[in-house]
Amino acid sequence: TPIPLMTGTDFEGISRVIEKQTGIPVFYFPTSGMHTYVKGAGMAMETIARELVPAGRKSVKERKNKQENPLKINILGATPLDFSINSTLDSIKEFLSRHFEIISTFAMGSSIEDIQRAGEADINLVISSVGVLAAKALEERFHTPYVIGTPIIGFENVLAEKLIESAWTKKSQTAYFSVLQKAHKKDTANFTTIQNAEAVSNLKKIRSLTETIEKNKVSGNVYIIGESVISQSLKAALALRYRIEATVICPLETEPEYTEKDVLLFSSEEDIKKAITDADTVIADPIYKTICSEKVNFVAMPHEAYSGRIYRKEVCDFIH
């Protein structure tokens, strides 16, 4: 709510009083009600990274045998708004555990004790825009590099390679940039078709991304509307796995560091409606279907930050 800010509430003073009386660390965030969840949740994760993670870590270059000592990783940017309460985050963890030792997840499914170990990680994976500020804070404090990208089937193995590369070079990067640059040059000959080893039968009733894309016959002039990191990772996955090019429209806050130049940044439905007049296929939360032409092949990708819990049962598992 913007009311405390409008009335000049002394957040810092209140925090000091409560902390003194209880002995519990207290933090405040200057929310104004004028931004999206990306900014608010991002500030919260950054504060956790700065205030709750003690100093002390061992450099990856001190490891004698990287096979006997798997690289340690934090997953940053996990919230129910972006990853719902379905199998996606569990699938991401299961995939990463094949290559890395997962220290903590900011901020679903990890205890305070897990998060306090975040400084031990060799590499941080930012799976949504919400985790970028925390990644920068951990890089500043512990010199831990980070990679931006969401593990999505067709793109997940490329992302794993980028994580290992950054852990050893100590250079942060946005994983989908190299994939999308090749796609722009029409140079798809060197793209690797990713084969996922997990059987679809294991999904039970969970809706898989593979099933969603193939069943809806995604083709033609494709637009993806959604959160910046997830949408661009999906764009990379479509290019790698299906040779499909897509245009991303992001209605949320985003930064040039992890946003391609051709991403369309629109906050109003009117602007988005104008941008997709030539669309053959639109991949987005179901609330956007009302602004699409009846001729458009609309592929529903529910996102709780947009439509809440209405379409939760239809949320896809990104790894399958």
Where in this protein do the model-derived segments appear?
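An N-terminal assembly and electron-transfer interface module characteristic of large anaerobic redox
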Residues: 1-320
